[in-house]
Amino acid sequence: MHAYRTHTCGQLREQNAGETVRLSGWIHRKRDHGNLLFIDLRDHYGLTQCVIDTSNPNFGTVEGLRVESVITVTGKVVARTTETVNDKLPTGRIEVQVKELEVQSAADQVPLQVNSEQDAGEELRLRYRFLDLRREKMQRNMVLRSNVIASVRRRMIEQGFTEFQTPILTASSPEGARDFLVPARNHPGKFYALPQAPQQFKQLLMVSGFDRYFQIAPCFRDEDSRADRSPGEFYQLDFEMSFVTQDDVFAAIEPVIHGIFEEFSGFTGVKKSVSPYPFVRIPFDEAMLKYGSDKPDLRNPLVIVDVTDVFRRPDVEFKAFKGVIEKGGVVRTIRVPGVADRPRSFYDKLNDWARGLGAPGLGYIVFEGGAGKGPIAKFVPEAAQAALRQATGAVDGDAVFFVCDQPGPAAKLAGQARTEIATQLDLIAKDRFEFCWIVDFPMYEYDEERKKIDFSHNPFSMPQGGLEALETQDPLTIKAFQYDIVCNGVELSSGAIRNHRPEIMYKAFEIAGYAAEDLEAKFGGMLSAFKLGAPPHGGSAPGIDRMVMLLADEPNIREVILFPLNQRAEDLLMQAPNGVAPERLKELHLKLDLPKPKIAG
């Protein structure tokens, strides 16, 4: 017989009755019934009820053990009586009568309960992550993650991609987030950087003559935490393709993403539908207008409409809106069907919500009995109300909510209002995954803080119209061959057709204020490669963590990462980041210049 187990704790069934077996695992629960002690023994695979009676010499030993102690039991499988069957467990029709018992590891008092789903607080859970990971939900989430990655690999290979590993130690680059820097001991004053993404390396692979690359790539960014973003590191399905258009990239990755979500869409116990591919494509400008976001949740049926022209009419006397419009502002509205009978408190609550975001409120008109009602209805005459109905599709029984501001802030608040209203009314469908592509991103944006034009997103994107567009168009009108894939309001991936021609790259960076010398200093390796024959290429990088988060229906990405950092980018279990000995700093030629501690009061 094996030293530790003949079966797992999730394996035994009625047909095993009469067998002598050996199991090993953690004590999940103990129940003392006087002459009998019941133990729920747990391993990765499940639970088995074990029974030990007072005649067993090990009874006292087990009685003194705490939950989470690790034991090995040997005993006989017996069928449970009808009244003691537990059909909630796969092993619930049998139990093991313990004959022998060995303590492998006695546990101290545990700081959090593994056998309970009660929230212990994130700080405690992360400090004792190894205990937290013993819980059934966490075990299932991590196995889901493993299975998703295995499925991704299989599907990418079936699509003709080859997996390569790119360097972890590289050069710092001026991408979006801060780099994590690693001092180079043999090169005083110089640093490696952990890659924010394998961006340059995967492009160099295309220049090297490889046609379709992918990897499950670790990425490192020194950025703040969010519910859908873990600080420090994350993993993405990084891929790149040669001699492709944007359509080719979409056609390659859509079956992979769709297949993953179809395969695992029933993970939570409720099978969700997955939008078919080809996925809907929405231009960036349209997304910002209709949804107030470049990450629209298409499960939400509400749509934003621009009604600036209605409030610009001479017969509309609402000066609060007119004054903003005269200064270049816009009016956006959201039609909400069937809420005319809602009490005044519904509208007041939404106004309070908007004020909490720093807005003056949400104006609204309720349509009933052929007329508009509400605080601003008296300023909008019948003809203008008819124009509002036509623009929004509103009918009696509906309400329309208004946001008025400069275009950027108006789009943002309208998008937030769209989500808030749909959430309050429970309009967002929970039974499906809705995918879309956001395309035609602006190549550049105006940086108000620095008073200059800069790249809007990825500086390596090919501008639509190529060199001619860069030389003849207003930079703020140029679109890029850049795209995001979005699911249920979560950005899964950014990608682009790359700028592989040096003359176009020099001009693109010049417009953003970078001299040729700057470009060569930062991206010299890639530029020199492009000057020696580079194919047109493009790719993307869907986030593994975010895909698993959606499939597991978890609101926080840390629920699908084994050992995540907390919101302050600390590893509470391993006590990282930590200080290092002075001699280590000396050999790295570093001196600390720490901020002075703040004086209280």
Swiss-Prot record:
Disulfide bonding pattern of the chain: none
InterPro entries, alphabetized: Aa-tRNA-synt_II, aa-tRNA-synth_II, aa-tRNA-synth_II/BPL/LPL, Asp-tRNA-ligase_1, Asp-tRNA-ligase_1_N, Asp/Asn-tRNA-synth_IIb, AspRS_core, GAD-like_sf
Predominant subcellular localization, coarse grouping: cytoplasm
Pfam families in UniProt: GAD, tRNA-synt_2, tRNA_anti-codon
Keywords tagged on the record: Aminoacyl-tRNA synthetase, ATP-binding, Cytoplasm, Ligase, Nucleotide-binding, Protein biosynthesis
One GO location term (cellular component): cytoplasm
Chain's role: Aspartyl-tRNA synthetase with relaxed tRNA specificity since it is able to aspartylate not only its cognate tRNA(Asp) but also tRNA(Asn). Reaction proceeds in two steps: L-aspartate is first activated by ATP to form Asp-AMP and then transferred to the acceptor end of tRNA(Asp/Asn).
Official protein name in the record: Aspartate--tRNA(Asp/Asn) ligase
